[in-house]
Amino acid sequence: MTNCTVLDWQGKEAGESSIDLKTAKESSAADLLHRAVLRQQAHSRQGTASTLTRSEVRGGGRKPYKQKGTGRARQGSIRTPLRPGGGIIFGPKPRKYNLEMNRKERRLALRTALMSRIPDAKIIKDFGSKLEVPKTSEIVALLKRVGIDSDVKILIILNKPSEIIKRSIKNLEKVKLISADQLNVFDLLNANSLVIGEDALSTIKEVYGND
């Protein structure tokens, strides 16, 4: 179990919370997280690259010039890979890059990644509840009050972020906002700093703590 200090919007202590999720063994955690990140990145690839082979490239079957007497190397087709505009040998074709990983492993990897970041995470009570209009400066000021530089990669996890909060964060290039039920291993490990809404922490326990 990991205990967390809850901060208010001004960056002052407002209570405590705790979270306890099942994680992978230390001996296998690194391998599990590595496979989970590889899988996520592989699934983001489009796999639409395609080239034409010598049978698909445009052109006739006519011999470009006679076999003998030209002093040049013999050629049987203008579609040969040896000629400019000819077919491609072993070129890419549309394919899926998906990597298999069973559900238990995926959830275990996610919980392991999350619990590894919780000790350094900032838990904020009523995140942005007092914002009446979108103000990026308010988000920057909050990050500064809790000791986070807005120039580093920051992941903000909220339960149900409002449109005001989304628009307030939108202009911050290195700040990413995701919902508590949409967590993924790559974002958790890629961020330099983690900010979690207190209500989002409850959702995380509910969604990911049942295994």
UniProtKB/Swiss-Prot annotation:
Residues 41-54 have a biased composition (Polar residues). One of its GO terms (cellular component) is ribosome. The keyword Nucleotide-binding does not apply. GO terms for molecular function: rRNA binding; structural constituent of ribosome. Signal peptide: none annotated. Residues 60-71 have a biased composition (Basic residues). Pfam families: Ribosomal_L4 (PF00573). Keywords: Ribonucleoprotein, Ribosomal protein, RNA-binding, rRNA-binding. One of the primary rRNA binding proteins, this protein initially binds near the 5'-end of the 23S rRNA. It is important during the early stages of 50S assembly. It makes multiple contacts with different domains of the 23S rRNA in the assembled 50S subunit and ribosome. PANTHER family: 50S RIBOSOMAL PROTEIN L4, LARGE RIBOSOMAL SUBUNIT PROTEIN UL4C. Belongs to the universal ribosomal protein uL4 family. Part of the 50S ribosomal subunit. This is Large ribosomal subunit protein uL4. It comes from Prochlorococcus marinus (strain NATL2A). The lineage of its organism: Bacteria, Bacillati, Cyanobacteriota, Cyanophyceae, Synechococcales.
